């Protein structure tokens, strides 16, 4: 019996030892690999010349094993060549060329930042190397930054040579040169030949190397860049990412919520203005159903809330439009129609004031804060304007302007801005305010007393906006808070032209500064268009963080705008 037990123990030890030997590897619990991979060797070597046009293989060796699928989406050859992938142990990549190279041509091989190792660590920046079938390597370069992308998000940079085609059909053809944005959105295109280029930053979700503007975000440049002996390298061609919409909006459906409220579904967010044409008739007798109010739905920008007179349960309604416009400026002027019948439900929501800001007895309010009102039901804003009163500490009545945000809420801005170290009282005669159907709210007089922060708790930022050329159009600065804390998160200032600025009453904290040139004078940044093509407006983002201290003016915060190209 002891011999059998001994044999069993011996066998167990042997099997355990064998298993441990067979599963050798990195010891568990070691540090996680966070080191980004790098390219350690290429063939041809970078800057090689007189490379034969019948070159068949390009080799790329990485510092560690790569995730092969990610690399296949991140390798580009410019000008484009047809090739196949072959791997050796996931570290050495061979590109098997199936084309004949052009004579006297510099070729650029780019490995973008989407390429990652087996631990999902991406290349820190795009890697490029070049070789030539001729006697020299082209040395032109364009660099810049892509703004508005998410952390770890990558955008492709497409470079088109304008002389490649008589038509600027950027949607239909692939770019001559390609790179990818890297850490913090930085990008560079190297080894460019002398010519004029138009660049785009492209999301390229399907990796087809085409601009699919209908569903991909893109960045349009502010000008074209010419590379020549006088300007071999250009730095500072930056992009702001946006959705360049080219499709006109249209109705997608309608839902009666109750007998006075409709939800009109549209293909994309609309701009509601005086031109927006919506009307409703009963198709049985052509009687008109009056629309009392409309606004964008709180929960979905693709829904328009429409409030009407009480609907007839026997009617067959049709909602018509011959003009709607989306937020990108695309207009639909064709006749559109949706059919619906009344919902029998009745809205029983009580008439209440949901929010009144500043709150009663609020202290240390920031001067840029408007008076904000929000109601439980769609309100007749004319009745609000007639029954609202704002007084300063000397009991003087202050006039101002209402900014209607929706049928439910609005902001009041006094004609003379609120002052620091001062107190105010806002009165609302609630009993004389009515909803869209004329129903009055409960009779009461509401007043809010509030005081503003001391000027000793605020700081200032000043400097100069400059540009090499003066063009007609105002300049808009935005000072945005980066650190957490109380107070307004951003400050906006308009200048008639580039020049000296001063932003006052800024809470203590860290801020970023940006500026754009409103050349089309529409009071917002224009990101450019593909059809018909137009450049983006010039903008600039200050690289340094601004630290604002109370009772202190942060001076000399200067920022320069780039000069745009022509249309």
What are these regions (language model features)?
Residues 125, 203-243, 335-338, 343, ...:
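Structured interaction patches on ligand/partner-binding surfaces of diverse proteins
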């Amino acid at each position: 019996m002891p011999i059998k037990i001994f044999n069993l123990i011996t066998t167990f030890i042997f099997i355990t030892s064998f298993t441990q030997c067979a599963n050798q590897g990195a010891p568990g619990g070691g540090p996680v690999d966070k080191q980004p991979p790098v390219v350690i060797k290429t063939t041809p070597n970078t800057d090689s010349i007189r490379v034969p046009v019948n070159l068949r293989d390009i080799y790329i060796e990485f510092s560690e094993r790569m995730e092969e699928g990610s690399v296949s989406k991140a390798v580009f050859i410019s000008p484009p060549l047809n090739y196949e992938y072959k791997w050796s142990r996931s570290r050495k990549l061979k590109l098997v060329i199936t084309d004949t190279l052009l004579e006297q041509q510099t070729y650029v091989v780019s490995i973008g930042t989407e390429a990652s190792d087996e631990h999902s660590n991406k290349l820190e920046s795009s890697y490029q190397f070049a070789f030539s079938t001729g006697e020299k390597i082209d040395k032109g370069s364009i660099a810049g930054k892509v703004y508005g992308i998410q952390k770890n998000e990558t955008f492709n940079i497409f470079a088109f040579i304008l002389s490649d085609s008589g038509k600027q059909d950027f949607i239909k053809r692939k770019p001559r040169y390609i790179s990818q944005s890297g850490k913090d959105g930085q990008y560079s295109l190297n080894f460019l030949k002398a010519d004029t280029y138009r660049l785009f930053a492209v999301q390229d979700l399907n990796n087809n190397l085409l601009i699919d503007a209908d569903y991909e975000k893109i960045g349009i440049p502010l000008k074209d860049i010419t590379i020549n002996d006088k300007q071999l390298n250009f730095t500072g061609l930056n992009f702001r990412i946006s959705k360049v919409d080219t499709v006109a909006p249209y109705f997608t459906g309608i839902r009666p919520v109750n007998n006075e409220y409709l939800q009109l579904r549209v293909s994309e967010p609309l701009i509601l203005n005086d031109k927006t044409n919506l009307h409703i008739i009963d198709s049985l007798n052509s009687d008109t159903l009056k629309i009392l109010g409309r606004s964008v739905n709180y929960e979905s920008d693709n829904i328009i809330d429409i409030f009407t007179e009480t609907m007839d349960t026997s009617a067959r309604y049709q909602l018509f439009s011959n003009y709607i416009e989306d937020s990108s400026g695309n207009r639909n002027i064709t006749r559109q129609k949706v059919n619906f019948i009344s919902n029998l439900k009745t809205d029983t929501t009580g008439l209440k004031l949901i929010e009144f800001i500043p709150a009663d007895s609020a202290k240390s309010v920031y001067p840029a804060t408007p008076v904000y009102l929000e109601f439980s039901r769609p309100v007749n804003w004319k009745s609000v304007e007639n029954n609202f009163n704002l007084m300063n500490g000397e009991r003087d009545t202050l006039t101002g302007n209402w900014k209607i945000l929706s049928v439910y809420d609005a902001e009041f801005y006094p004609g003379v801005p609120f002052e620091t170290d001062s107190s105010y009282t806002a009165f609302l005669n609630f009993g004389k305010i009515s909803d869209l159907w004329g129903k009055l709210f409960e009779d009461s007089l509401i007043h809010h007393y509030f005081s503003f922060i001391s000027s000793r708790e605020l700081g200032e930022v000043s400097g100069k906006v400059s540009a090499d050329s003066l063009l007609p159009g105002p300049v808009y600065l935005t000072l945005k808070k980066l650190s957490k804390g109380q107070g307004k998160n951003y400050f906006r200032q308009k200048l008639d032209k580039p020049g000296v600025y001063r932003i006052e009453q800024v809470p203590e904290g860290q801020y970023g500064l940006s500026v754009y040139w409103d050349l089309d004078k529409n009071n917002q940044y224009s990101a450019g268009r593909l059809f018909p093509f137009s450049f983006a407006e010039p903008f600039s983002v200050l690289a340094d963080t601004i630290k604002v201290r109370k009772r202190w003016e942060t001076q000399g915060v200067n920022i320069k705008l780039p000069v745009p190209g022509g249309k």
